[in-house]
UniProtKB/Swiss-Prot annotation:
The lineage of its organism: Bacteria, Bacillati, Actinomycetota, Actinomycetes, Propionibacteriales. Gene3D superfamilies: Vaccinia Virus protein VP39. This is tRNA (guanine-N(7)-)-methyltransferase. The gene is trmB. GO terms for molecular function: tRNA (guanine(46)-N7)-methyltransferase activity. Pathway: tRNA modification; N(7)-methylguanine-tRNA biosynthesis. The active site is at residue 178. Disulfide bonds: none annotated. S-adenosyl-L-methionine binds at residues 103, 128, 155, 178.
Length: 276
């Protein structure tokens, strides 16, 4: 989800300055995952880092709840990167094997907390890069009693690439991602052909990719990208190609902003099909 505007900080530290994390619970690291001498080329990301100012409640959440809900992953060149060779040990993290849902960009955690609490039979992992949003999400997970949810502070595409294997995911959610309106910024859109191929590889056959946006041009961009992926097929799509609103998805402040501004909310639901 899109964060509220905040003053921009320098986007990332250099590889020499980058903070490196030790692997957290449930993270397997293969040989070569921390090769500090390697030259790393940073790719295009779908976000701009902002200053991590937190209020008292958010700071308290980071101090008291991070050890419960935040998965610390090995880093590569930046504080939101993921080291190649890392892999989540999901049974170790959750203490069981259960269907897994991943959310890209949890924002303030409204969707993650509500649906994790509503579905204790499933496990949930949310990606987010903004520290205040993560802290707010930790509070909401705790208040909801969502012990089956975790958060990772990382670029979601790197996380999908390095932390999960083929067919690990039952569902993936991308709700109200930054639309990056300017044409020269379209390469930053999280929904793009490369991400679609990656998501398809991580979804099990029959798994779902649920998306929503309040911007018409991004909605049609998503539709074009997903339609070009041969292993994804639309679910309950109308003549315009869009799906009905998923009734379980809570109305967040991001969706409310779009509705208040008079924009149409577009939902897309696509299923990963078997290769044949």
């Amino acid at each position: 989800m899109r964060p509220d505007p905040a003053p921009l900080d320098p986007t990332d530290a250099s590889p020499a300055q980058a903070r490196r994390h030790q692997p957290g619970l449930g993270v397997e690291v293969s040989a070569g995952a921390h090769r500090s001498g390697d030259r790393v080329r940073r790719g295009v990301v779908s976000f701009v880092r902002r200053s991590p100012r937190m209020n008292v409640s958010q700071q308290r959440a980071m101090n008291t709840l991070a050890s419960t809900y935040l998965i610390d992953v090995p880093r590569d060149a930046t504080s939101t990167s993921v080291a190649p060779g890392s892999r989540l040990d999901l049974p170790a993290i959750f203490g069981r094997t259960a269907p897994l849902t991943v959310e890209i960009g949890v924002g303030s955690g409204d969707v993650l907390a509500a649906l994790a609490a509503a579905h204790p039979e499933r496990d949930f992992i949310g990606f987010e890069v903004y520290l205040p949003s993560i802290a707010t999400t930790l509070n909401k997970l705790e208040n909801a009693g969502a012990s089956n949810a975790r958060v990772i502070m990382a670029d979601a595409t790197a996380g999908l690439d390095h932390l999960f294997g083929p067919a690990d995911l039952d569902e993936l959610w991308t709700f109200f991602a930054d639309p990056w309106h300017k044409k020269r910024h379209h390469k930053r859109r999280i929904v793009n052909p490369d991400t679609a191929r990656l998501v398809t590889s991580r979804l099990r056959p029959g798994g779902l990719w649920r998306l929503a946006t309040d911007w018409d041009d991004y909605a049609h961009w998503m539709l074009e990208v997903l339609s070009a992926e041969p292993l994804l097929k639309p679910v309950d799509a109308g003549p315009d190609g869009f799906s009905p609103r998923w009734p379980e998805r809570p109305v967040t402040r991001y969706e409310n902003k779009g509705l208040t501004a008079g924009r149409t909310i577009h939902d897309l639901t696509w299923r990963r099909v078997d290769e044949s």
